[in-house]
């Protein structure tokens, strides 16, 4: 054995230990559906994107059934700027008029969706890109948001334009794709009963998909480590009741609130557990599913 091979042995032993640790986790998830929401910001780093695609292929080859839902907010914003279309946000959601929804569909269901399919294909996976309009997979209704005016303390409804909320998921479309041993890559664009195209928040879309599929896990990849306490430290595990309490006491605020609402909805629809984790961490998905340490904040119906 050469000196270089001898020097490499400790690293090989570490990798072997990792594989041994991963085996029971792989067996636990065998043939189980895992829905992964892949955020727009996490896609900005090419190396991280390739790592993500590699992880997805490894999940599929390990016996899991990964379903990918992607966002694309930053990419949409850049395209709107290039086209001279002004972006407006109300209550954290993009106000979507007729011109904007065309751009949203073009960016999400077109360039981003096919880019992710290409990354997975490059790693040896078989992926298919779809959006909620394909096969009438996700029907949506116009979203409504009610806010309290801080001056009058009266409620008022916020008009978000062509922003939709999932109303019905046609599971048969997804079942057919999974039966064909393909990895679905889904853009959060849905259709109304009248044929209108709707822009759907990617977290909300992923929650609806996971609920319809009764997924084993829903992973929400974000730009933060998970749910943080008031001292900005990661909370490793929460129950649904804990989540509601932390929202009520102001620990969970801002953009994390709709993510928590998605988690609660998915769990109430039959998803076993949801994890909010940092998509910028290398191989975060594998760390969560295949190691004893996990990653991010695990949310389940009740405390273990």
Swiss-Prot record:
Signal peptide: none annotated. GO terms for cellular component: cytoplasm. It comes from the Bacteria. Substrate binds at residues 72-73, 94, 199. Keywords: Amino-acid biosynthesis, Arginine biosynthesis, ATP-binding, Cytoplasm, Kinase, Nucleotide-binding, Transferase. The keyword Plastid does not apply. One of its GO terms (molecular function) is acetylglutamate kinase activity. It is found in: Cytoplasm. One of its GO terms (biological process) is arginine biosynthetic process via ornithine. It catalyses: N-acetyl-L-glutamate + ATP = N-acetyl-L-glutamyl 5-phosphate + ADP. InterPro entries: AceGlu_kinase-like_sf, AcgluKinase_fam, ArgB, Asp/Glu/Uridylate_kinase, Glu/AcGlu_kinase, NAGK-C. Pfam families: AA_kinase. Its main location: cytoplasm. The record marks 37, 259 as: Transition state stabilizer. Its EC number is 2.7.2.8. Catalyzes the ATP-dependent phosphorylation of N-acetyl-L-glutamate. Belongs to the acetylglutamate kinase family. ArgB subfamily. PANTHER family: N-ACETYLGLUTAMATE SYNTHASE, N-ACETYLGLUTAMATE SYNTHASE, MITOCHONDRIAL. This is Acetylglutamate kinase. The gene is argB.
């Amino acid at each position: 054995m050469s000196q270089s091979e001898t020097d490499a042995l400790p690293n090989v032993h570490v990798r072997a230990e990792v594989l041994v640790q991963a085996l029971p986790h792989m067996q636990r998830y065998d043939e189980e559906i895992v829905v992964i929401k892949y955020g727009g910001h996490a896609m900005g780093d090419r190396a991280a994107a390739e790592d993500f695609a590699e992880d997805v292929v490894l999940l599929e080859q390990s016996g899991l059934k990964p379903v990918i839902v992607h966002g694309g907010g930053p990419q949409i914003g850049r395209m709107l700027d290039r086209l001279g279309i002004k972006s407006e946000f109300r209550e954290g959601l993009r106000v979507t008029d007729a011109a904007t929804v065309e751009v949203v569909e073009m960016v999400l269901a077109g360039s981003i969706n096919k880019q992710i399919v290409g990354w997975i294909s490059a790693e040896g996976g078989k992926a298919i890109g779809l959006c909620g309009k394909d096969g009438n997979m996700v029907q949506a209704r116009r979203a409504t948001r009610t806010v309290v005016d801080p001056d009058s303390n009266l409620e008022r409804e916020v008009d978000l334009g062509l922003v939709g909320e999932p109303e019905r998921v046609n599971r048969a479309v997804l079942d057919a794709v999974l039966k064909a041993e393909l990895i679905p890559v889904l853009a959060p664009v849905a259709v109304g009963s009248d044929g209108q195209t709707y822009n759907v928040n990617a977290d909300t879309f992923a929650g609806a998909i996971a609920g319809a599929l009764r997924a084993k896990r829903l992973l929400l990849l974000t730009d933060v480590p998970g749910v943080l306490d008031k001292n900005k430290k990661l909370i490793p595990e929460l129950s649904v009741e804990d989540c509601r309490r932390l929202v009520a006491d102001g620990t969970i605020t801002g953009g994390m609130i709709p993510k928590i609402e998605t988690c609660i909805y998915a769990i109430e629809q039959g998803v076993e557990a949801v994890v909010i984790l940092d998509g910028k961490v290398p191989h975060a998905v594998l760390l969560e599913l295949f190691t004893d340490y996990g990653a991010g904040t695990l949310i389940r119906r009740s405390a273990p």
